[in-house]
Amino acid sequence: MPKKKAFTPLPYLASIVFLPWWISLSFNKSLESWITNWWNTRQSEIFLNDIQEKNVLEKFIELEELFLLDEMIKEYPETHIQKLRIGIHKETIELVKIHNEGHIHTILHFSTNITCFAILSGYSILGNEELVILNSWLQEFLYNLSDTIKAFSILLLTDLCIGFHSPHGWELMISSVYRDFGFAHNDPIISGLVSTFPVILDTIFKYWIFRYLNRVSPSLVVIYHSMND
């Protein structure tokens, strides 16, 4: 019975790793047609954010300029003007299609991520016993490591997260999450998050060293500061 219980966290850990990917893929396939049909039938004229509205309006201004150009070249043959009007009509249809696809993409990804978060939260609550066992395994593994390896691991992790070159990684990660939720790229917001997250993590980490490591393992703190210097 203890052996059987000891092995139960392994499939649980594997399910936590692969479950989000499987849920995302399944929900994208199942919700895509429903959201597409819902969006096309409701015929909404509301833009999801100011950036999308600005982009679409800029495209319509370009089309309007083409219409003005059409008026200016009326002395050209009728066939040439007809081709120009057909081209503008096709561009307008393509613009509307791109606009709709952008809205559908935003709604689909946002709904999928919210659903995944809700399912994983419930899954974690139901698997509380497995989480306790995983936590004990992790604590035992870390306890068996030498102080030098622990200090090296902490130093490597902090350099990756809050080191000199970390803003580039944070920018890629935040942009990826931002895009995964279906939001349009926004440089001011991303730059603000990139400049804020490392500072917050650095403060939390220093507080953790001061409150926890100094009390639990003073030798580890000495080795860490020696390697960091």
Curated annotation (Swiss-Prot):
<keyword id="KW-0934">Plastid</keyword>
<keyword id="KW-0150">Chloroplast</keyword>
<feature type="transmembrane region" description="Helical">
    <location>
        <begin position="7"/>
        <end position="27"/>
    </location>
</feature>
<keyword id="KW-0633">Potassium transport</keyword>
<dbReference type="GO" id="GO:0015297">
    <property type="term" value="F:antiporter activity"/>
</dbReference>
<protein>
    <recommendedName>
        <fullName>Potassium/proton antiporter CemA</fullName>
    </recommendedName>
</protein>
<keyword id="KW-0630">Potassium</keyword>
<keyword id="KW-1133">Transmembrane helix</keyword>
<comment type="function">
    <text>Contributes to K(+)/H(+) antiport activity by supporting proton efflux to control proton extrusion and homeostasis in chloroplasts in a light-dependent manner to modulate photosynthesis. Prevents excessive induction of non-photochemical quenching (NPQ) under continuous-light conditions. Indirectly promotes efficient inorganic carbon uptake into chloroplasts.</text>
</comment>
<dbReference type="GO" id="GO:0006813">
    <property type="term" value="P:potassium ion transport"/>
</dbReference>
<keyword id="KW-0812">Transmembrane</keyword>
<comment type="similarity">
    <text>Belongs to the CemA family.</text>
</comment>
<keyword id="KW-0472">Membrane</keyword>
<keyword id="KW-0050">Antiport</keyword>
<dbReference type="GO" id="GO:0015078">
    <property type="term" value="F:proton transmembrane transporter activity"/>
</dbReference>
<feature type="transmembrane region" description="Helical">
    <location>
        <begin position="154"/>
        <end position="174"/>
    </location>
</feature>
<dbReference type="InterPro" id="IPR004282">
    <property type="entry name" value="CemA"/>
</dbReference>
<dbReference type="GO" id="GO:0009706">
    <property type="term" value="C:chloroplast inner membrane"/>
</dbReference>
<keyword id="KW-0813">Transport</keyword>
<keyword id="KW-0406">Ion transport</keyword>
<feature type="transmembrane region" description="Helical">
    <location>
        <begin position="114"/>
        <end position="134"/>
    </location>
</feature>
<keyword id="KW-0375">Hydrogen ion transport</keyword>
<dbReference type="Pfam" id="PF03040">
    <property type="entry name" value="CemA"/>
</dbReference>
<keyword id="KW-1001">Plastid inner membrane</keyword>
<feature type="transmembrane region" description="Helical">
    <location>
        <begin position="189"/>
        <end position="209"/>
    </location>
</feature>
